[in-house]
Amino acid sequence: MNWETAVSFCDDGIVSSDAIVGLLSDNLRLGNAQAALAERYRRMQSLYPNASADDPRWWQDGCTIADPRSHWDVLLGIPRNVFGADNPTWCGTGGILNCEDVGIDLPTWMMRRNANPQIRIMVVAEEPKRQGLGTGALWVSSPWAFHSMEYRNHSRNPRMRTIIEAFMQDKEGVVYMTDIRKIYAKGTAHRGFDGTYRSILDCEIELFNPSVLIGYGSTVLDELRPGLSGHPDGAFARLVCHRPYEDLYNGVRTLVFAHPSPLNASLGCVASNVINENPGITREEAIVKYYTEW
């Protein structure tokens, strides 16, 4: 599939980007940064097909862009002054922007252009990790950075493109992607909003109305079903190494899988189990089969 011409990205007819920005801003106390996030959606919608990471059209007034030579995902930096000094959550003593590598991923949604989707798939990842960006700004991207032409075409994790493409093409779906924990600060998801993250997800479910919810990793299961996955992570790995954990969340069919990161060692067990049932396929084919055949 040619994603540049065949994919519709963040169509407001599927979900209102303004509604998502309002939801995040209200619950995460983003204050004056709300306008920058709304503008970021407009840039992503218009520049998705063919804008390079160093295209000057990505720049927004009062904000910055991380060096595109090392950040192909076109990270938008919203600095402290945009939030305003009267925003203690972000700018006060102990405010979030005093932490390093603060990040948020704006939810995005995609489908084949001019398609008639047969299923609405919500994909929930863990958290918006960042690295090497210092303090004083909120760095904005999207889950797996599919908004960036270069990142999606040269990703270090092409597996996710294969999986999402299968959801759009083979399952004829519209796919909404988000993180369960919305804010990341160096080393961990920012915990100041722990009680809020699930309520934000509940609102996203209302806005998107998914047919199925797909979760990746133990963090997602811990948020949806606190205490179920157990610790250490080995308990979760055993729970999902043959097939995803299945449940209902808010009345929606929910499947939680092992995290698809190439760094996840438990995927060796996943691949072995699938290959045992499907002799002759490769390890990567087995892993993709695990994530896409449900």
Summary of predicted features, one role per range:
Residues 2-214, 218-227, 260-265:
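A polyanion-binding, active-site-adjacent surface
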Residues 221-240:
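Active-site-adjacent alpha-helix immediately C-terminal to a catalytic or transition-state-stabilizing loop
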Residues 226-228, 270-275:
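Generic alpha-helical propensity signal that fires on short helical segments
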Residues 234-273:
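Short, flexible loop segments at boundaries between secondary-structure elements
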Residues 275-294:
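Histidine-centered active-site loop/cap adjacent to the catalytic His
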